[in-house]
Amino acid sequence: MQQNGRTYIAIDLKAFYASVECMERGLDPLTTNLVVADASRTEKTICLAVSPSLKAYGISGRARLFEVVERVKEVNAERRRKAGCLSEKSFNANELAAYPSREVDYLIAPPRMAKYIQISSQIYNVYLKYIAPEDIHVYSIDEVMMDVTNYLQTYRMTACELAKVMISDVLHTTGITATAGIGSNLYLCKVAMDIMAKHVQPDKDGVRIAELDEMSYREQLWAHRPLTDFWRVGRGYAKKLEAIGI
């Protein structure tokens, strides 16, 4: 994808804080039920991260701890209804899928920001193996955007191939996987990652990559709702836009 002469890649580390905590415990981030939260506070505390296997039960990435507790209770009530009774607990998604009579459990990891910053820096150094720092925009601790225009010919790769190589390197270096978006400008690569990649079938490592240009954006997202899915569109803007029919 190289419309208007430029190509951009956005990369978002998957459930970053939760993935770091899983790796620190020698657990698979994709199959371990884990939330990052300060359990010493009340159950109203906000979870900083929720692992993908817990999100699969309909728990949001920024749930309050009591919402996690209640949802897991509901899941176990349904499992109990089907199995008759539940035996031992498990926080492993593969085990829970294989043994319907096991009770869904999860780990609560207290936040460790210094550790997350350390791992984020390690991952940034992986990106620097492929892309110069002036072409990398660090958007947050777990997300970057890159102008890869001048690298595709050098590496003789498509943007998708380059994204896969970098994500694979991050995975082998840290055990953490990611989602990527590719676009002909920064906005499109971000939206491709935030919206379109969610509907892409993940590969064996859980990686999803989606692409957008101006034409495919119009074709696939012109009527997309809710508007708050789009980058930088909050509830206030969405309400105003919907009021004028947009």
Ranges and model annotations:
Residues 1-246:
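Gly/Gly-Pro- and Ser/Thr-rich, intrinsically disordered tail segments characteristic of DNA damage-repair
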